[in-house]
Protein backbone atom coordinates (compact mmCIF):
# COMPACT_ATOMS: atom_id res chain seq x y z
CA UNK A 1 0.00 0.00 0.00
CA UNK A 2 1.60 3.28 -1.10
CA UNK A 3 1.78 6.31 1.13
CA UNK A 4 0.55 9.47 -0.56
CA UNK A 5 3.16 11.63 1.19
CA UNK A 6 6.23 9.59 0.33
CA UNK A 7 4.84 7.34 -2.43
CA UNK A 8 6.44 4.40 -0.62
CA UNK A 9 4.86 0.95 -0.53
CA UNK A 10 5.60 -1.70 2.08
CA UNK A 11 6.03 -5.22 0.76
CA UNK A 12 3.80 -7.73 2.60
CA UNK A 13 6.86 -9.84 3.42
CA UNK A 14 8.09 -7.00 5.68
CA UNK A 15 5.01 -7.27 7.88
CA UNK A 16 4.94 -11.08 7.81
CA UNK A 17 8.59 -11.45 8.83
CA UNK A 18 8.13 -8.85 11.57
CA UNK A 19 5.18 -10.83 12.96
CA UNK A 20 7.33 -13.96 12.94
CA UNK A 21 10.08 -12.12 14.83
CA UNK A 22 7.58 -10.78 17.36
CA UNK A 23 5.36 -13.83 17.91
CA UNK A 24 7.53 -16.83 17.09
CA UNK A 25 10.99 -15.32 17.67
CA UNK A 26 12.19 -16.93 14.44
CA UNK A 27 14.67 -14.10 13.89
CA UNK A 28 16.98 -11.98 16.03
CA UNK A 29 16.78 -9.07 13.60
CA UNK A 30 15.45 -7.94 10.23
CA UNK A 31 17.13 -5.38 8.00
CA UNK A 32 14.94 -3.54 5.48
CA UNK A 33 15.88 -1.38 2.52
CA UNK A 34 14.02 0.83 0.13
CA UNK A 35 14.08 -0.68 -3.35
CA UNK A 36 12.65 1.74 -5.88
CA UNK A 37 9.22 2.64 -4.52
CA UNK A 38 8.84 -0.01 -1.83
CA UNK A 39 10.36 -1.23 1.42
CA UNK A 40 11.66 -4.81 1.18
CA UNK A 41 13.35 -7.32 3.48
CA UNK A 42 17.10 -7.37 2.89
CA UNK A 43 18.41 -9.66 5.65
CA UNK A 44 16.96 -11.98 8.28
CA UNK A 45 19.16 -12.72 11.28
CA UNK A 46 18.85 -16.13 12.92
CA UNK A 47 18.08 -16.33 16.67
CA UNK A 48 21.70 -17.41 17.27
CA UNK A 49 23.15 -14.21 15.82
CA UNK A 50 24.14 -11.44 18.22
CA UNK A 51 24.21 -7.65 18.20
CA UNK A 52 27.69 -7.47 16.64
CA UNK A 53 26.51 -9.73 13.81
CA UNK A 54 23.56 -7.40 13.27
CA UNK A 55 25.61 -4.20 13.16
CA UNK A 56 28.11 -5.79 10.75
CA UNK A 57 25.30 -6.27 8.21
CA UNK A 58 24.45 -2.55 8.14
CA UNK A 59 26.19 -0.92 5.17
CA UNK A 60 28.58 1.90 6.14
CA UNK A 61 27.41 4.28 3.38
CA UNK A 62 23.72 3.45 2.88
CA UNK A 63 20.57 3.99 4.91
CA UNK A 64 18.50 1.09 6.24
CA UNK A 65 15.62 0.38 8.60
CA UNK A 66 16.00 -2.48 11.03
CA UNK A 67 14.26 -4.20 13.90
CA UNK A 68 16.23 -5.97 16.59
CA UNK A 69 14.82 -8.28 19.27
CA UNK A 70 17.00 -7.46 22.29
CA UNK A 71 17.07 -9.91 25.21
CA UNK A 72 18.21 -8.61 28.58
CA UNK A 73 18.03 -9.27 32.32
CA UNK A 74 16.61 -6.62 34.64
CA UNK A 75 18.16 -5.58 37.97
CA UNK A 76 15.60 -7.91 39.58
CA UNK A 77 17.07 -10.79 37.54
CA UNK A 78 14.03 -11.08 35.27
CA UNK A 79 14.52 -12.11 31.61
CA UNK A 80 12.87 -9.68 29.20
CA UNK A 81 13.09 -8.62 25.59
CA UNK A 82 12.28 -5.43 23.72
CA UNK A 83 11.87 -4.87 20.02
CA UNK A 84 13.90 -1.94 18.75
CA UNK A 85 13.26 -0.05 15.53
CA UNK A 86 16.52 1.41 14.25
CA UNK A 87 16.71 4.04 11.54
CA UNK A 88 20.27 3.76 10.22
CA UNK A 89 21.25 6.88 8.29
CA UNK A 90 25.05 7.18 8.15
CA UNK A 91 26.52 10.65 7.63
CA UNK A 92 28.37 9.30 4.59
CA UNK A 93 25.18 8.24 2.75
CA UNK A 94 23.80 10.33 -0.11
CA UNK A 95 21.57 13.27 0.86
CA UNK A 96 18.74 12.08 -1.40
CA UNK A 97 18.82 8.64 0.20
CA UNK A 98 18.67 10.16 3.70
CA UNK A 99 15.69 12.28 2.67
CA UNK A 100 13.77 9.30 1.23
CA UNK A 101 14.39 7.18 4.33
CA UNK A 102 13.50 10.05 6.69
CA UNK A 103 10.25 10.86 4.88
CA UNK A 104 9.13 7.20 4.80
CA UNK A 105 10.19 6.15 8.32
CA UNK A 106 7.04 6.96 10.32
CA UNK A 107 4.75 5.40 7.72
CA UNK A 108 6.84 2.23 7.62
CA UNK A 109 7.12 2.03 11.40
CA UNK A 110 3.32 2.19 11.71
CA UNK A 111 3.11 -1.00 9.63
CA UNK A 112 5.14 -2.85 12.28
CA UNK A 113 2.83 -3.12 15.27
CA UNK A 114 4.80 -3.93 18.41
CA UNK A 115 7.86 -1.67 18.22
CA UNK A 116 8.85 -0.77 21.79
CA UNK A 117 11.89 1.47 21.36
CA UNK A 118 12.99 3.66 18.46
CA UNK A 119 16.58 4.66 17.83
CA UNK A 120 18.08 6.83 15.11
CA UNK A 121 21.76 6.47 14.34
CA UNK A 122 24.12 8.27 11.99
CA UNK A 123 27.24 6.37 13.08
CA UNK A 124 27.89 3.12 14.98
CA UNK A 125 28.60 4.90 18.29
CA UNK A 126 24.97 6.10 18.40
CA UNK A 127 23.71 2.53 18.48
CA UNK A 128 26.35 0.80 20.59
CA UNK A 129 25.33 -2.15 22.72
CA UNK A 130 25.60 0.08 25.82
CA UNK A 131 23.07 2.51 24.34
CA UNK A 132 20.74 -0.36 23.41
CA UNK A 133 20.98 -1.71 26.98
CA UNK A 134 20.30 1.70 28.54
CA UNK A 135 17.27 2.29 26.29
CA UNK A 136 15.86 -1.17 27.06
CA UNK A 137 15.76 -0.65 30.83
UniProtKB/Swiss-Prot annotation:
User: What's the main place this protein lives?
Assistant: cytoplasm
Q: In which tissues is it expressed?
A: Specifically expressed in pollen.
Q: Which CDD domains match?
A: ADF_cofilin_like (cd11286)
Q: Which InterPro entries match?
A: ADF-H, ADF-H/Gelsolin-like_dom_sf, ADF/Cofilin
GO BP terms in the entry: actin filament depolymerization; pollen tube growth
What terms describe the molecular function in GO for this protein? actin binding
Residue positions, PTM Phosphoserine: 6
**One Pfam family linked to the record:** Cofilin_ADF
- Keywords attached to this entry: Actin-binding, Cytoplasm, Cytoskeleton, Phosphoprotein
Similarity-based family: Belongs to the actin-binding proteins ADF family.
Q: What is this protein called?
A: Actin-depolymerizing factor 12
Which species is this UniProt entry from? Answer: Arabidopsis thaliana
- What phylogenetic lineage does the species belong to? Eukaryota, Viridiplantae, Streptophyta, Embryophyta, Tracheophyta
Which gene is this protein's source? ADF12
Amino acid sequence: MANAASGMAVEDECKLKFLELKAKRNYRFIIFRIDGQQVVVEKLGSPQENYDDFTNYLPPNECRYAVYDFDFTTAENIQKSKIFFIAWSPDSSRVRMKMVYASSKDRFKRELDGIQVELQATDPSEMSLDIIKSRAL
